[in-house]
Amino acid sequence: MPNAPCLMPSLTITRPAILQLDHVTKQFPASSTAAVEDVSLTLAQGDLLALLGPSGCGKTTLLRMIAGFEPLQSGTIALAGRTVASSGVWVPPEQRSVGMVFQDFALFPHLTVEQNVAFGLQKVADSAQIKARTAEAIAQVRLQGLENRYPSELSGGQQQRVALARALAPRPALILLDEPLSNLDVQVRLRLREEIREVLKSAGISGVFVTHDQEEALAISDQVAVMQQGRLEQLGTPEEVYHHPASRFVAEFVTQANFIAARRQGQLWQTEVGNFKLPPDEWIESESGDLMVRQEDLLLEADPEATVVIRDRHFLGREYCYCLSTLSGQELHARTTTAINLP
């Protein structure tokens, strides 16, 4: 698959937009390149957006600009139809109706669960409203009975639920989550990412979720924005991004796909590991290029005359990952069920 220009599928927004970014750019004074460059996207009310990319790609900087923690260089940020940042407009963070969940929980150690959740309500509600909203938020994240505990008496997963409840309590229009699961162990992460999606969906609150974990982004979001070096490489549904990557970077980063040199012969693409037939809607004019083959699409069979050698095999529980070497020395990876057990 040759490098392709960034493809932005036209997403039909039937619900009002809760977040709109138009040509947003940010460059720090000490840097020669932009941290965020010309990013435009729209998030519909009630949807969850994952900002996905490697470290340093600009996703956290973009999140901080949406929150109001970083000024932008150029472009426009609008929340619920209201411009909150542009060349002539600056709305401070506390007036943006945005909740924030941080990677390190950011709880007050001297306050109880109830007091932490209620903290952001002190200036916007009376005592009766504070009590009602605090109880509602604690119930939303299923922490009833732990109201009087301190953060030091909670597990990591429980602390992150408190942080989420605190963000939910003021009933913001949008919640921003900056890699909220990265400090948790695997089982807690899997459970909590399901709960975060369920809580936000049931509350009808939109969310922007920053992560460098591909599986996490695909599982939790309605839209995925893949970023590289400050630019938006692709915006689409998880299925679109996975099955129709817009560039080689997206294919490599999101699916860990193999790329195999290929030459066209009629309707077939010939490679050193076999021939591939592409469906008509994926035909291209070029006579040669790199063919993208996902790890799960490589089918393995034992063949004593084959030129592909199994170099190693990793057991991953539900599947095997085979490390392969071709005659030319290229390294490939294939994933199979454990029912396929090659030597």
Residue ranges and their predicted role:
Residues 52-54:
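The feature captures the beta-strand-to-loop junction immediately N-terminal to the Walker
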Residues 60-63, 162:
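ABC ATPase nucleotide-binding domain helices that frame the ATP-binding cleft
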Residues 67:
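Helix-to-loop junction immediately C-terminal to a conserved catalytic motif
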Residues 75-86:
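Conserved ABC transporter NBD signature motif
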